[in-house]
């Protein structure tokens, strides 16, 4: 039996053990992981540096290197996320609803773990910690399959997690990493129906599309973030500037950063040139339609592909429109149903935007950068779902549970 199947089989066995663990036992394991990550920070950073140096030698982009990079502060942030997770209510065993039938049967709908979660993801080693700890908190076994670019960091983090779990009542194999990063191992994971209850892809559009297209196991789709901000005619100038600059430049390599600004022509006539200048001073490359080019000749003419692209860098597309209806049509055509924002003082337009735009998170007068489990108060998240079944938006603890019905009687038979 090869590595992937062997780990799948073991995960299925471990999941049956995890469902018996109490909240306190799971929280003790999480606390041990948080402590161990701090104790072994130097080891993790050493392995991360090894991966970064290999990435530079291979010519990785700055945005990819940023996603791969770990620092002492990022590891501290991971542990803070775990501590927040410990404080969150455990959804497992929670009664979702309860009622009694006329025949005396008492019916309860209860939350239960999904079982075995497969996680396939690119670049970010912090996902290794997020996925492992959220799965443990919800009583799920997890099989992790990261990318070759992050293999050194991922192996180090999982080794640290195993050393932490060894001191607790949870099996070390509750968290397993597939070290084979070839396409063959991914394809096996896609079809491991006997062992996986759900597969969650987290990464770029190509990875997600491949998983959705090829997997036979149930998939929780975490879509790419082709996010937009629409600046309505009535938008406050300073607010619009602040939100656009934050949503694009604070951390351009993440999925909740914006990739296109849609400007109402009347607002752009007054403030567009100044906005473009402000963005360019911050290193942003602008790609716009003909109307944008007429305002600023340094803007590159946007191609059809640009409207579809999640740049994950300091590149921003610019679209000018004459109405909110045109803005909504553009966003619904090219958006990835992740996060979309409107900056406006017109409540009627805001309401129209909220009703008409199809996305997991919609914002009024705020940056899209808040689409995040911790910012929503969920603690660490396992991803941001852009699909409509099971769960949508940042996936916190309840997203990694299912339900079952528990029926109590006193001898009832069906007539």
Curated annotation (Swiss-Prot):
Reaction catalyzed: L-glutamate 5-semialdehyde + phosphate + NADP(+) = L-glutamyl 5-phosphate + NADPH + H(+)
Pfam families with a match to the protein in the record: Aldedh
Main location as per UniProt: cytoplasm
Cellular localization per UniProt: Cytoplasm
Any one annotated GO CC term: cytoplasm
GO molecular function terms noted in the UniProt entry: glutamate-5-semialdehyde dehydrogenase activity; NADP binding
Family: Belongs to the gamma-glutamyl phosphate reductase family.
PANTHER family tied to this protein: DELTA-1-PYRROLINE-5-CARBOXYLATE SYNTHASE, GLUTAMATE SEMIALDEHYDE DEHYDROGENASE
Record-given protein name: Gamma-glutamyl phosphate reductase
Gene this chain is encoded by: proA
């Amino acid at each position: 039996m090869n590595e992937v199947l062997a780990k799948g089989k073991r995960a299925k066995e471990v999941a049956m053990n995890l469902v018996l663990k109490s909240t306190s036992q799971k929280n003790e394991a999480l606390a041990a992981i948080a402590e161990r990550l701090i104790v072994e920070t130097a080891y993790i950073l050493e392995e991360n540096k090894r991966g970064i140096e290999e990435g530079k030698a291979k010519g990785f982009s700055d945005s990819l290197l940023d996603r791969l990079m770990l620092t002492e502060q990022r590891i501290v942030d991971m542990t803070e996320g775990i501590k927040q997770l410990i404080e969150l209510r455990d959804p497992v065993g929670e009664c979702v609803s309860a009622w009694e039938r006329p025949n005396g049967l008492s019916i309860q709908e209860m939350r239960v773990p999904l079982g075995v979660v497969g996680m396939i993801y690119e670049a970010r080693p912090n996902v290794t910690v997020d996925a492992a700890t959220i799965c443990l908190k919800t009583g799920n076994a997890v099989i992790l399959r990261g990318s070759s670019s992050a293999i050194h960091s991922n192996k180090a983090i999982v080794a640290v997690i195993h050393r932490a779990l060894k001191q607790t009542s949870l099996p070390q194999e509750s968290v397993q990493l597939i070290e084979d990063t070839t396409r063959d191992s991914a394809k096996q994971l896609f079809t491991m129906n006997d062992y996986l209850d759900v597969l969650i892809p987290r990464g770029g559009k190509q990875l997600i599309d491949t998983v959705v297209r090829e997997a036979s196991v149930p998939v929780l789709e975490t879509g790419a973030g082709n996010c937009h901000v629409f600046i309505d005619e009535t938008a406050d100038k300073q607010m619009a500037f602040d939100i656009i600059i934050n949503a694009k430049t604070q951390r351009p390599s993440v999925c909740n950063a914006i990739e296109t600004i849609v400007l109402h022509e009347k607002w752009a006539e007054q403030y567009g040139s100044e906005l473009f200048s402000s963005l360019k001073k911050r290193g942003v490359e602008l790609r716009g339609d003909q109307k944008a080019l007429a305002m600023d000749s340094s803007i590159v003419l946007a191609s059809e592909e640009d409207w579809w692209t999640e740049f994950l860098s300091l590149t921003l597309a610019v679209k000018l429109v004459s109405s909110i209806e045109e803005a909504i049509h553009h966003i619904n055509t090219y958006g990835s149903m992740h996060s979309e924002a409107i900056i406006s003082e017109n409540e009627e337009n805001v309401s129209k935007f909220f009703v008409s735009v199809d996305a997991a998170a919609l914002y009024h007068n705020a940056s899209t950068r808040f689409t995040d489990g911790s910012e929503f108060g969920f603690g660490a998240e396992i991803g941001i779902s852009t699909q409509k079944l099971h769960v949508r938006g940042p996936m916190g603890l309840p997203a990694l549970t299912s339900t079952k019905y528990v029926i109590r009687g006193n001898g009832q038979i069906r007539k």
